[in-house]
Amino acid sequence: MEEEMIIGISTSFSAAHSIPGHKKCGKVHGHNFKVEVEISGKVKENGMVMDFFDLKRIVNEVVAKFDHTLLNEQIEIPTSENICLRIFSELAEKGLNVRRVRVAENEDKWAEIRR
């Protein structure tokens, strides 16, 4: 029986945002966001679920549109949660069997979705 395997990569982007109506984060400020993505699938004959380079390329295509931008221009309320949901959705639309996406604003604040 073939087992399902989980693989993952991490990448990052820098961006600014403000959270409308938030007392502290309502002003434009920036973060160096870290993004972690995990996908799952069967190990193919080549010994891989997916080539890490291909996975990183696809994730970077999605994340690149956020790099060095004002996130409010792309996501109405650009919380870490909504950024995470957007990345998850766009990766799923590209046909990846996404298991987990984590978006971290810094070392001690992040949002994560798992399926």
UniProtKB/Swiss-Prot annotation:
Keywords: Lyase, Metal-binding, Zinc. The keyword Lyase applies. It comes from the Archaea. The keyword Metal-binding applies. One of its GO terms (molecular function) is metal ion binding. Binds 1 zinc ion per subunit. The active site is at C25, H68, E105. Zn(2+) binds at H17, H29, H31. Pathway: Purine metabolism; 7-cyano-7-deazaguanine biosynthesis. It is an enzyme of class 4 (lyase). It catalyses: 7,8-dihydroneopterin 3'-triphosphate + H2O = 6-carboxy-5,6,7,8-tetrahydropterin + triphosphate + acetaldehyde + 2 H(+). Gene3D superfamilies: 6-pyruvoyl tetrahydropterin synthase/QueD. InterPro entries: 6-PTP_synth/QueD, 6-PTP_synth/QueD_sf. Pfam families: PTPS. Its cofactor is Zn(2+). Its EC number is 4.1.2.50. Belongs to the PTPS family. QueD subfamily. Catalyzes the conversion of 7,8-dihydroneopterin triphosphate (H2NTP) to 6-carboxy-5,6,7,8-tetrahydropterin (CPH4) and acetaldehyde. The active site is at the interface between 2 subunits. The proton acceptor Cys is on one subunit, and the charge relay system is on the other subunit. This is Putative 6-carboxy-5,6,7,8-tetrahydropterin synthase. It comes from Archaeoglobus fulgidus (strain ATCC 49558 / DSM 4304 / JCM 9628 / NBRC 100126 / VC-16). The gene is queD.
